[in-house]
Amino acid sequence: MTKFVFVTGGVVSSLGKGIAAASLAAILESRGLKVTLLKLDPYINVDPGTMSPFQHGEVFVTEDGAETDLDLGHYERFVSAKMRKSNNFTTGQIYESVIRKERRGEYLGKTVQVIPHITNEIQAFVERGAAASHDGKADVALVEIGGTVGDIESLPFLEAARQMSLRMGRNHCAFVHLTLVPFIASAGELKTKPTQHSVQKLREIGISPTALLCRADRPIPDDERAKISLFANIPQDAVISVWDADSIYKIPQMLNEQGLDRLICEELRLDPKPADLSMWQKLVNAQENPEHEITIGMVGKYVDLTESYKSLIEALRHAGMHTATRVNIEYIDSEELESGHLEVLAPLDAILVPGGFGKRGTEGKIRAIQYARENKIPYLGICLGMQLAVIEFARHLAGMTDANSTEFNLETEHPVVALITEWVDREGKVEQRSADSDLGGTMRLGAQRVPVKEGTKAATIYGAEVNERHRHRYEVNNHYVPTLEKAGMVISARTPTENLPEMMELPESMHPWFVGVQFHPEFTSTPRDGHPLFKAYVEAALASQQRKGA
């Protein structure tokens, strides 16, 4: 039977519950246990797909096409299990499911209430999500409950967790509570009172934490840990100090050294082999002792909120670990490039335009792409970044001066990028969309296998086939592909059924390394293995740096 570890947060949000849960899962996996993770989000949105990146940060896309919380990206980077749609659900999905059941008459005329109907549905979703991994044979499922203890939105989830613990019995559920111990500069000391109140609030709900993870900007002294232990009624060895680290990949070792995995295994009556964190130590060592250093310019419109590009930033770091390179990222606001200021691009070793939506800032991105092409700076375009590379090429090399995407200009004379209205999804089903379709859940989503053209950079990087995840509505217009190819562009990968361009590149006679991809490779990069495309991109940046210095 799968055992559960519920991870909750107190005092404030953004303490890093997702990284804490993923780190604990990584330690348990290193002990030979089969682990999976779930994220429960208390907002009423069905999923984060239509939420602003400023509100929510990145939307992480799973292999089966779910638009999910960015914490699922952390989960996949820390453990070997692949996340699915069932690994993330929201209050909106729970209420939607309960209301559908009520309309079908499944409650037999009963008054439908938060308790027991909503809490029962939450428990069913949790158990179904845990059963989706490892053929239903996961040893431990870590369940992160979003929000903060005390928020009205989180109460049904916490109550469901309490009921699960009661129903399953002792030694089948554990609770890890993440809380803040702030340092007050004027007093020159750490304050434990917020943590005491947070634990008290949790105990009022009926939950006593197995372990307390105390977040601070510095290690918490033993006397403060003893004080927290006394007032929170938790053994002192279960009060874990989690201080700010310069790399999230140091957290598994930090938690293991303080015995968190031992506490959880004892609580759940598990007796696995000792933890082996040598892989994590090796990765941290590679990160801290690089042989090279490069600077990549990321040109976007959400650059003030880097959470919007979380998986992409981590993918570049992974590539750095696997090429002995420190990768510095310069965030460049594309709107500032629209009025000039291209001189900020000159010192860069490579330029990257990530995915995005909407017209704002696109002309600045196109100017950055033109600069990269004309100055032979390695370029990687992802999703929108590929579409804009096609537009730039069409305007300046293929004679279509007003080329554009119908996303930005419906009246353009040359719609080289247009709305995709019909395609075959990963399960072979025909999907159809129009400009009037709902925004939520109507994109081309999830992983798809695509053959690669021989003799291209894409083939050198990927081999014969690409299997990557998508999240987009617009595609390169096949009508213009012959004209683009005649001007020198290489379409190096196409979908097998609709023949839609998936990868484009420029031949070496035109540019040393210029690649665009319609998919999102950052979602499949892990610190363990890196990603072939990002490794090739970093290597191209290193080569460019050497050419400049020669």
Swiss-Prot record:
SUPFAM superfamilies: Class I glutamine amidotransferase-like, P-loop containing nucleoside triphosphate hydrolases. InterPro entries: Class_I_gatase-like, CTP_synthase, CTP_synthase_N, GATASE, GATase1_CTP_Synthase, P-loop_NTPase. Its EC number is 6.3.4.2. One of its GO terms (biological process) is pyrimidine nucleobase biosynthetic process. Mg(2+) binds at residues 71, 144. L-glutamine binds at residues 356, 384-387, 407, 473. Coiled coil: none annotated. Pathway: Pyrimidine metabolism; CTP biosynthesis via de novo pathway; CTP from UDP: step 2/2. Keywords: ATP-binding, Glutamine amidotransferase, Ligase, Magnesium, Metal-binding, Nucleotide-binding, Pyrimidine biosynthesis. Residues 1-270 are annotated as: Amidoligase domain. GO terms for molecular function: ATP binding; CTP synthase activity; glutaminase activity; identical protein binding; metal ion binding. Pfam families: CTP_synth_N, GATase. Disulfide bonds: none annotated. ATP binds at residues 14-19, 71. The active site is at residues 383, 520, 522. Residues 295-547 form the Glutamine amidotransferase type-1 domain. It catalyses: UTP + L-glutamine + ATP + H2O = CTP + L-glutamate + ADP + phosphate + 2 H(+); L-glutamine + H2O = L-glutamate + NH4(+); UTP + NH4(+) + ATP = CTP + ADP + phosphate + 2 H(+). One of its GO terms (cellular component) is cytosol. CDD domains: CTPS_N, GATase1_CTP_Synthase. Signal peptide: none annotated. Allosterically activated by GTP, when glutamine is the substrate; GTP has no effect on the reaction when ammonia is the substrate. The allosteric effector GTP functions by stabilizing the protein conformation that binds the tetrahedral intermediate(s) formed during glutamine hydrolysis. Inhibited by the product CTP, via allosteric rather than competitive inhibition. PANTHER family: CTP SYNTHASE, CTP SYNTHASE-RELATED. CTPSs have evolved a hybrid strategy for distinguishing between UTP and CTP. The overlapping regions of the product feedback inhibitory and substrate sites recognize a common feature in both compounds, the triphosphate moiety. To differentiate isosteric substrate and product pyrimidine rings, an additional pocket far from the expected kinase/ligase catalytic site, specifically recognizes the cytosine and ribose portions of the product inhibitor. Homotetramer. NCBIfam families: PRK05380.1 (NF003792), PyrG (TIGR00337). This is CTP synthase. It comes from Cupriavidus necator (strain ATCC 17699 / DSM 428 / KCTC 22496 / NCIMB 10442 / H16 / Stanier 337). The gene is pyrG.
